[in-house]
């Protein structure tokens, strides 16, 4: 800690063994909005029907690998034989071979290039409408409950998109528009500002509204006046999902393919298969993101 924080002045320090999947824990923790707790998911073997294992072949790697081996054996031996999985790895794993049956396949990838594969999948999914629109449209807990969903996301939350702005890339908050802070939530003494979303009628609302919000937003808003800026101009904003799509489009599918060594047709086929199972598809990479870009790889997988 002293070497990293005092010598280099970085806050990017975390106390955990790299061999145990530190980049995966931190990357997924960032995606889930909890860097201190570093939450991360495990495959729901009972309810899933398709598994994508990136650098973490079940029964051979991953965490906990012994339990995953047992879970894989159970899923693979179901009478209905509906569980399918793909193992992404530079090396042929034992969990994806002729001896393991015909309900799986191995996808070879260049070492350390998994991020390019995942971003290629994300680009194809967003370009072809292969995403869970109902889930992604719920901006907060109230909307989630009203829609009968199990979770909500920040896909609809608006981001400041003005080059040179001190908060370029940050979320737009209610205070930016002059909205009053909401009362503290139950069990807390501190009020937390809301995020801003656009509703179907084009109006702006807090993310706590009990209704879905728009996924694809690119517009301008007028910030609240302040002593430092008594006459603010229009501020360009974008929704988070719109921003993700634009970032994914910075490279073509062919460029992603060249980077990771997986043909573009294979990336498309994998993305199509992954999205054909709806909420019954899972992705896991615990221990499989140990590279220089591991944090970003884990973050992309979690998205």
Where are these regions (language model features)?
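Flexible loop/turn segments at secondary-structure boundaries
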Residues: 1, 20-24, 59-62, 92-97, ...
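Short secondary-structure boundary/capping segments
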Residues: 2-4, 66-70, 100-107, 122-125, ...
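Anionic-ligand anchoring segments at beta-strand to alpha-helix junctions in alpha/beta enzyme folds, i.e.
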Residues: 1-47
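Long, well-ordered, tryptophan-enriched scaffold segments
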Residues: 79, 86, 96-277
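Acidic catalytic cores of enzymes that act on phosphate-bearing nucleotides/polynucleotides
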Residues: 268, 272-303
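An acidic- and aromatic-residue-enriched active-site/binding cleft used to recognize and process polar
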Residues: 56-57, 90-93, 111-112, 272, ...
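A conserved hydrophobic secondary-structure block that centers on an alpha-helix together
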Residues: 17-19, 37-97, 106, 246
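Glycine- and acidic
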Residues: 53-58, 103, 236-237, 251-257, ...
């Amino acid at each position: 800690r002293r070497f990293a924080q005092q010598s280099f002045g970085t806050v990017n320090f975390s106390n955990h063994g790299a061999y145990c999947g530190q980049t995966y824990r931190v990357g997924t923790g960032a995606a889930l909005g909890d860097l201190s707790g570093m939450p991360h998911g495990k495959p729901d073997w009972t309810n899933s029907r398709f598994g994508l294992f990136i650098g973490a072949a079940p029964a051979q790697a991953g965490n906990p690998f012994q339990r995953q081996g047992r879970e894989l054996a159970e899923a693979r031996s179901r009478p209905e034989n509906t569980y399918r999985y793909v193992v992404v790895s530079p090396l042929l794993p034992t969990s994806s071979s002729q001896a393991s049956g015909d309900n799986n396949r191995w996808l070879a990838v260049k070492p350390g290039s998994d991020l390019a594969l995942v971003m290629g999948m994300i680009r194809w999914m967003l370009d072809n409408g292969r995403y869970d629109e109902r889930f992604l449209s719920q901006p907060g807990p109230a909307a989630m409950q009203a829609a009968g969903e199990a979770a909500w996301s920040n896909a609809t939350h608006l981001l400041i998109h003005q080059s040179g702005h001190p908060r370029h890339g940050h979320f737009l908050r209610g205070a930016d528009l002059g909205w009053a802070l909401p009362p503290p939530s139950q069990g807390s003494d501190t009020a937390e500002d809301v995020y801003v979303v656009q509703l179907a009628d084009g109006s702006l609302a807090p993310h706590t509204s009990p209704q879905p919000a728009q996924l694809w937003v690119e517009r301008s808003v007028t910030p609240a006046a302040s002593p430092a800026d008594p006459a603010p101009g229009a501020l360009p904003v974008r929704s988070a999902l719109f921003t993700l799509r634009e970032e994914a489009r910075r490279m073509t599918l062919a460029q992603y393919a060249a980077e990771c060594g997986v043909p573009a047709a294979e990336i498309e086929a994998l993305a199509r298969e992954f999205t054909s199972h709806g909420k019954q598809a899972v992705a896991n990479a615990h221990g499989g993101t140990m590279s220089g870009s591991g944090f970003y790889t884990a973050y992309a997988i979690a998205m």
